[in-house]
């Protein structure tokens, strides 16, 4: 297993902290006028999602986290588990709701997501950056509504609610940015 020194820390690096896989979100090298230099990092625990700040003396090391990001296809939800499959090997994984978190509202069957595996167990699911979903319910638009005139809430086929321009109607397909949960544009069928 690889070991990273403090001078090798960078954003996005996956390391083990307190026996849990973590991802470095922010890394800052600090050299005070008096005393030893140190590195301050902000890390996200990949299992719990909690973000904490830690300080390491210059020369400290952390082991690498044995995590793998695998592209998987979302198959179905059986009520308590969401099922994903690796397209190449047809290997299937079941993911619970607490691991899926907010990603569940953007998943449509057959979508390809990135699933983070640790010890061959899924610990995080990242939906595609943009998804195309149908609007199942929204207020009717009136003649003369334009894109600059504000917005209205719309319920999508997955149950997610996003703000859309006034001219968008029920039944239309729209493109949504899953990172922000915002309407991007209309989509062609």
From Swiss-Prot:
Post-translational modification: May be beta-lysylated on the epsilon-amino group of Lys-34 by the combined action of EpmA and EpmB, and then hydroxylated on the C5 position of the same residue by EpmC (if this protein is present). Lysylation is critical for the stimulatory effect of EF-P on peptide-bond formation. The lysylation moiety may extend toward the peptidyltransferase center and stabilize the terminal 3-CCA end of the tRNA. Hydroxylation of the C5 position on Lys-34 may allow additional potential stabilizing hydrogen-bond interactions with the P-tRNA.
SUPFAM superfamilies cross-referenced by the UniProt entry: Nucleic acid-binding proteins (SSF50249), Translation proteins SH3-like domain (SSF50104)
Pfam families, per the entry: EFP (PF01132), EFP_N (PF08207), Elong-fact-P_C (PF09285)
GO cellular component, one term: cytoplasm
Protein origin, superkingdom: Bacteria
UniProt pathway annotation: Protein biosynthesis; polypeptide chain elongation
GO molecular function annotations of the record: translation elongation factor activity
Cell location: Cytoplasm
Residues with PTM N6-(3,6-diaminohexanoyl)-5-hydroxylysine: 34
Keywords: Cytoplasm, Elongation factor, Hydroxylation, Protein biosynthesis
Function of the molecule: Involved in peptide bond synthesis. Alleviates ribosome stalling that occurs when 3 or more consecutive Pro residues or the sequence PPG is present in a protein, possibly by augmenting the peptidyl transferase activity of the ribosome. Modification of Lys-34 is required for alleviation.
Family the UniProt entry places it in: Belongs to the elongation factor P family.
The protein's name in its UniProt record: Elongation factor P
Gene source species: Legionella pneumophila (strain Lens)
Gene for this chain: efp
